[in-house]
A protein has these predicted regions:
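Mature catalytic core of soluble alpha/beta enzymes
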Residues: 1-330
């Protein structure tokens, strides 16, 4: 995963996605729903290190609240598996020891999906980039940091620990490839959790749903038949949207280096090219619209590290996926 997992980075990215969606979506909502329409239920929380939101329409408020509560409990359970902030999480234990026996099936499944997207993007998406993030964080945390970034030798040493092919995954155990290797799931876990919540609600009979767990996925639209409307944040003004899209039966994710810059110029940021070991700068942002949030999340991350021609080649393999690649030239 090219995006690091720690909470400050996740929170910044989630907030601009949430604000963009709220700003764009609020205009589509009637000020006072017609009496014949099901009421809208909105639940906001602080999960996965950032603000989250579930919106749904249903005539039974008690049933809606109970369903949302079950979903939030599931999010917390998955967070205890995927989190790097929780020292007892399955991922933290894997990174500490390099091996994990009897891993949770959700971790096995998610790493399997991640490996698929790594292969599909020729390694541009890689869950093992955490050593690069640690290197850049340490470098730019120093008061006299070289503005050009870490020394080439230090990047090479970090890169020697990066490589999705080194990770061994089975239902019985997961093993990292070498000492100092570490995994971050921040380029795919939010999408996975968004899908889990959406599918739980759908299984319980809720279909007019918009879920935001860092990535967004919608089922049917509003009670009045209008679609949900989601705004894509402007790279220079992340609190505002430069484009608003309808969202029904689809998911969307956006990646942008402006979300967590390491330096004032923004040239060094949290979206790494795991092949070069440096921040990718082909685009200001990449937004992906896909049937599910896991795909949207992973591809928005992986495509960010690919030049346009290579990115389009990847997209050709996904006929149900669309992308907006906002280049540095605008």
């Amino acid at each position: 995963v090219n995006r690091p997992h720690p909470a400050p980075d996740r929170a910044g990215r989630r907030r601009f996605l949430k604000i963009a969606a709220a700003a764009a979506g609020s205009a589509a909502l009637p000020t006072r729903p017609a009496p014949s329409l099901s009421p809208r239920h909105v639940e906001r929380d602080f999960l996965l290190g950032a603000d989250t939101e579930i919106q749904l329409y249903h005539p039974d408020a008690q049933a809606a609240r109970a369903a949302i509560a079950r979903c939030l409990a599931e999010v917390r359970r998955l967070e205890a598996i995927f989190s790097l902030e929780q020292p007892t999480s399955a991922l933290s234990r894997l990174n500490r020891s390099g091996r994990l026996a009897d891993p949770p099936p959700e971790l096995v499944a998610l790493l399997g999906r991640a490996a698929h997207f790594s292969r599909a993007t020729c390694g541009a998406f890689d869950v093992t980039v955490q050593p690069l993030w640690e290197l850049f964080r340490r470098h730019f945390s120093a008061g006299d940091a070289d503005v050009n970034g870490p020394a080439a030798g230090n990047i090479e040493r970090a890169l020697s620990r990066v490589g999705y092919r080194q990770v061994q995954i089975s239902p019985e155990h997961i093993a990292l490839g070498c000492d100092g290797a570490a995994i971050t799931l921040n380029g795919i876990a939010q999408g996975f959790i968004t899908d889990r919540v959406t599918e739980m609600l759908q299984a319980q009979g809720f279909d007019q749903v918009l879920v935001n767990m860092g990535e967004m996925r919608a089922l049917r639209g509003h009670a009045d038949g209008t679609p949900w409307r989601v705004g894509i944040a402007h790279p220079d003004q992340p609190w505002s949207s430069f484009l608003t899209l309808p969202l029904v039966g689809r998911a969307i994710a956006t990646s942008g280096g402006y979300g967590t810059p390491f330096d004032a110029s923004g040239r060094h940021h949290h979206l790494f090219d795991p092949r070069s070991g440096t921040s990718a700068n082909h685009y200001r942002s990449v937004s992906v619209l896909a049937p599910d949030a896991t795909t949207a999340d992973a591809l928005s991350t992986g495509l960010f590290a690919l030049p346009p021609k290579a990115a389009l080649a990847v997209l050709n393999a996904y006929p149900n996926v669309g992308a907006l690649l906002l280049t540095t030239e605008g």
